[in-house]
Amino acid sequence: MITIKRGLDLPIAGTPSQVINDGKTITKVALLGEEYVGMRPTMHVRVGDEVKKAQILFEDKKNPGVKFTSPASGKVIEVNRGAKRVLQSVVIEVAGDEQITFDSFEASQLASIDRQTVKTQLVESGLWTALRTRPFSKVPAIESSTQAIFVTAMDTNPLAAKPETIINEQSEAFVAGLDILSTLTEGKVYVCKSGTSLPRSSQPNVEEHVFDGPHPAGLVGTHMHFLYPVNAVNVAWSINYQDVIAFGQLFLTGELYTQRVVSLAGPVVNKPRLVRTQIGASLEELTDNELMPGEVRVISGSVLSGVKAAGPVAYLGRYHLQVSVLREGRDKDFLGWAMPGKNKFSVTRSFLGHLFTGQLFNMTTTTNGSDRAMVPIGNYEKVLPLDMEPTLLLRDLCAGDIDSAQRLGALELDEEDLALCTFVCPGKYEYGQLLRECLDKIEKEG
């Protein structure tokens, strides 16, 4: 067991009940273009086209052969683009159940399927995009390979679902997915989990590793740091546990599996719980009549690193297993910094709230202050458990010094790894955004 001592479990109200419920009927789904780092689409459909489930919607010009497929059958009703014609979303009105099917196999055959057959089926179905590389967090090139694949079978994000609840419901498909992953690498498949018991693969290159401790103990960046540190040469792939289930279902049934169990939670959710829905589901429909009155912000993903779901991107993200909802923090407290703050959370113990152990806080979107200088008072070291110098790294990200940032370990990180640093930062810096700009420059300059 690897125990993490530094980190932070956010004491936020609205913890979900760990019982899976059926969600609302979804009539619109979407693929979100901006989720895929560096992707430039070649469109295969236009508004008005009828599509089947698993039919190709677009390909990636920069990553030849990688296909992005429809999560449902129906009609393309929107192709939304933003500044500089960047693809925001392809929206489909769900109708019918027509789908493209693929080869199916017996569970005993999966580990003996040759690698090229596995790759071809994953690419044609669109499930290849469930894999992401580290560094850079991009969909891997089809002809690439890796010595390490990480399966994230735990989740320490605030308000997250417990993976064992979902995995044990789909144990056969989960094991089948692990068998499929074992064929994609000559190296190891690392299944990273908490202390709970999970279904196990019998393949010799599939290993289980137990992590314990506060967030970010459940992030793949933390797992890689301790088990297989990545750099420009050592490239690892990662996948979440629900996509492992989708891999297994694809090869067992020959059908694209797009079901998702997400946590619908937060301080303004009426009944926080686990909800069964599908990839790309409209979050306006999913949260209809589920929220308390008032101005709220719906987030696809975690409250720490998720994306505001509004307008053309108001849909469940490809890699997100949560829908979090917070009240918009428009109100200002007169001399709030001088008040005792019984109902306020503070990492630096500035308010009385830290004295009430176990108290959950109705957090909002407010930053509790304006932008200011970066102040190194030890906050970053408290929440980043990786063996690196966070203050120096974050300073280099702010200054745009990519050479120094790379030496300090920037290639190991993704936006979610620095989300807690953003949360505890007195200067209100968005370190995830600064990291992405740094990684883009490093990749561009080779």
Curated annotation (Swiss-Prot):
Pfam families: NQRA_2nd, NQRA_N, NQRA_SLBB. GO terms for molecular function: oxidoreductase activity, acting on NAD(P)H, quinone or similar compound as acceptor. Composed of six subunits; NqrA, NqrB, NqrC, NqrD, NqrE and NqrF. Belongs to the NqrA family. GO terms for biological process: sodium ion transport. Keywords: Ion transport, NAD, Sodium, Sodium transport, Translocase, Transport, Ubiquinone. The gene is nqrA. This is Na(+)-translocating NADH-quinone reductase subunit A. InterPro entries: NqrA, NQRA_2nd, NqrA_C_domain, NQRA_N. Signal peptide: none annotated. It catalyses: a ubiquinone + n Na(+)(in) + NADH + H(+) = a ubiquinol + n Na(+)(out) + NAD(+).
